[in-house]
Amino acid sequence: MKTLKINILAIALLAIMMQLTNMAWYGLAGDRWVELAGLKNVADIASATSPLAYIASIANAGLFCFMLAWIFTKLRVETALQGILIAISFYGCFVFFGAMTQDLFHLRPLMLTLINEGINFINYTLAGAVLGAWRKYEA
């Protein structure tokens, strides 16, 4: 039986892809997101954003993909569909419902939560598919 190993190249590419999906998602949701978040306008946000936010985003994506890849080696995930199902299960249990509950207690609009968490759903699905399909084995 072949032993699965972590695919570092897939993790690096996913971390970059996630930044691109984030930009596209918030580009589409821009004005509505700004309104729901109670901010002034997109231009003000772009000029005020610290480079630390981008560094944190890339680090978060890389760490998430590494941990998901590690979990996949333990669960013997061998297909994109298996990867998607596990990633979405983790997302629902550990991310979405926690974020939604917190936002509701902070009196934030549900639509804001759906916009913010919609991109996480897409990224978890993407990571599950890529890491499930693009497998590496120990020699």
Segments predicted by a language model, with ranges:
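Juxtamembrane/disordered regions of integral membrane proteins
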Residues: 1-139
